[in-house]
């Protein structure tokens, strides 16, 4: 009998105001079978919840722990060298005026301890994104100012910087059998699939260099089909998120107020992307089979990260979980429809 290969899960990054207990209760009450808390949600005191505490809460609410995301701290780790104040929302106040070297060292220690927790929980994937390793100029994706000129080559310098700054974290991940899953995303070390494949090349095919698929950032001509087919063998995790692009508006205008922007995250059912086709794409590139083999599970998570500049966060998230549960967790075909067309 045909069975689903997915289950509905939820990302914790936008729910940082909730405790782990509250987050898992919200996930369960909304209809999720799994949850992916963020690093902030699993913090406790000066460290993290113990693996036992996480397991106990998981069992209490009947919700699987599908992974622990750590986007913000990984991003700070590879961005601190720029001296940008944009790292401050994601690190403790005592680091706001510290040197880039001290911030980077703090992030490295924090992330290694987080990897210890993930390994103890038998989790294999850490969704995240690498920071501005190539500098803010290159992160614009537009070579003005010029990316190379007299005495400088920002991309070549960035390659060396990325390899050196990420070496310890990649080694620590490999030592624990973990996959560091980069979300291909604006203003990170990889804005598109070609950028990510370049990172894999310069790290000599490092096994820990993986991808979390997220179609909501495919809004500058690279479609989800193009992006995730190019990195297909590296996709070890998956977000479900939708968006619209408001017509006639510039995608890159200098306005940080989200309701004013052209690119808008929206509830899952009504965005520009067809989420069922996205789920089929994930099956086609082998994501659920890889996740199941890594974790010894019967299904792989579709991690809802639904958000909106207009709709209440909890309402948007709950709606997204229920949409995934009802529309994307479908029984998968065991044979071609053509096989049933012949005479018996």
Language-model regions, residue ranges each:
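Short, small-residue-enriched loops and turns at beta-alpha junctions
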Residues: 43-44, 74-76, 133-135, 186-190, ...
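Conserved beta-strand positions in the central sheet of alpha/beta enzyme cores
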Residues: 36, 67-69, 127, 181, ...
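Glycine-rich, positively charged N-terminal anion/phosphate-binding segment
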Residues: 20-23, 45-62, 66, 71
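Active-site acidic/histidine proton-transfer and metal-coordination neighborhood
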Residues: 17-25, 60, 79-210, 291, ...
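Short catalytic-loop micro-motif centered on adjacent basic/acidic residues
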Residues: 8-10, 36-37, 41, 180-183, ...
């Amino acid at each position: 009998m045909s069975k689903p290969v997915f289950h509905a899960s939820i990302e914790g990054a936008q729910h940082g105001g909730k405790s782990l207990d509250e987050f898992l209760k919200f996930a369960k009450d909304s209809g999720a079978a799994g949850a992916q808390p963020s690093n902030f949600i699993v913090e406790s005191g000066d460290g993290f919840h113990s693996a036992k505490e996480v397991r106990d809460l998981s069992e209490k609410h009947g919700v699987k722990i599908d992974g622990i995301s750590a986007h913000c701290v990984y991003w700070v780790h590879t961005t601190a060298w720029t001296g940008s104040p944009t790292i401050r929302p994601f690190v403790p106040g005592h680091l706001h005026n510290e040197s880039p070297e001290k911030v980077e060292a703090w992030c490295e220690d924090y992330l290694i301890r987080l990897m210890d927790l993930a390994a103890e929980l038998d989790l294999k994937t850490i969704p995240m994104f690498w920071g501005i390793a190539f500098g803010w100029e290159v992160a614009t994706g537009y070579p003005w100012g010029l990316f190379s000129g007299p005495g400088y080559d920002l991309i070549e310098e960035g390659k060396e910087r990325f390899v050196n700054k990420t070496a310890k974290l990649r080694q620590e991940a490999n030592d624990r059998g973990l996959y560091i899953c980069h979300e291909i995303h604006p203003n990170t070390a990889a804005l598109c699939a070609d950028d990510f494949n370049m990172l894999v090349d310069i790290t000599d095919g490092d096994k820990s260099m993986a991808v979390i698929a997220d179609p909501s950032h495919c809004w500058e001509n690279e479609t989800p089909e193009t992006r995730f087919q190019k990195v297909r063998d590296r996709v070890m995790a998956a977000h479900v998120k939708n968006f619209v692009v408001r017509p006639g508006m510039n995608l890159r205008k200098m306005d940080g107020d989200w309701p004013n922007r052209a690119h808008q995250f929206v509830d899952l059912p009504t965005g520009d992307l067809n989420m069922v086709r996205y789920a089929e794409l994930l099956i086609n590139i082998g994501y659920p089979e890889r996740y199941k083999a890594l974790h010894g599970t019967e299904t792989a998570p579709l991690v809802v990260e639904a958000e909106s500049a207009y709709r209440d966060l909890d309402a948007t998230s709950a709606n997204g979980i229920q949409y995934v549960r009802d529309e994307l967790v479908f029984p998968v075909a065991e044979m071609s429809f053509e096989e049933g067309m012949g005479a018996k």
